[in-house]
Amino acid sequence: MELKDYYAIMGVKPTDDLKTIKTAYRRLARKYHPDVSKEPDAEARFKEVAEAWEVLSDEQRRAEYDQMWQHRNDPQFNHQFHHGDGQSFNAEDFDDIFSSIFGQHARQSRQRPAARGHDIEIEVAVFLEETLTEHKRTISYNLPVYNAFGMIEQEIPKTLNVKIPAGVGNGQRIRLKGQGTPGENGGPNGDLWLVIHIAPHPLFDIVGQDLEIVVPVSPWEAALGAKVTVPTLKESILLTIPPGSQAGQRLRVKGKGLVSKKQTGDLYAVLKIVMPPKPDENTAALWQQLADAQSSFDPRKDWGKA
């Protein structure tokens, strides 16, 4: 298989720290989110970015990847072999084991006992809207074929139609029994594990079972109260902004969060007061009238007090 340049995909350098890589991931995930991107290959680019993040965000996997990338042009690194726990070892590691195996050639020539096939793990990107209901998904992956020494000889493309249940969460694992690699000598097949990755949303942040959305309001809407249209995962609603609202105030919308078998979360609208552009002469006069009318108000009266 082709070894992808995950750093190039993320637009970062191999020396960058995790914080820099995470920032790049969030930016690209939002850029290529199919709900907002107009690019024809947005979904493919989004999945590629998610794949790169899955490796570079894990310290051990990133170190293994860096080593493989460093030696990618070495013919000895054209193959890998795997243990059942999912670990991968390069050809140099294999040399020691290879000599050990041939030292026991007589025993290897006997009939080996039945052995269970290897499990396979793949990441599935799910959009927030898709978590509300059960939906079908076509999954494509490569089924490795191992030789007697645990080394991959070839990979066979495989496609499955699967159901992703409603209420799946980030990191949740879904088991598809028997869809891993075939067993040896009559042993059972391994399993396929789907690891759910909830894609970042351009509007909503996940907080447990709840969702948060930042709602921009004008100063007069915050002061006088208003009704504003706010999106949810299903449809738009009319949110009441109470008079005297403050920046950062959280307004709860019950039952509009994430759905699971046990509970349904809420949506929290976090108010953000947005000032109008630089005022003209008439607008400045109105602001001055307001300032004169509220001259006794000191917003910093309790500032810094415990």
Curated annotation (Swiss-Prot):
GO terms for molecular function: bent DNA binding; unfolded protein binding. This is Curved DNA-binding protein. GO terms for biological process: chaperone cofactor-dependent protein refolding; protein refolding. It comes from Shigella sonnei (strain Ss046). SUPFAM superfamilies: Chaperone J-domain, HSP40/DnaJ peptide-binding domain. Keywords: Chaperone, Cytoplasm, DNA-binding. It is found in: Cytoplasm, Nucleoid. Pfam families: DnaJ, DnaJ_C.
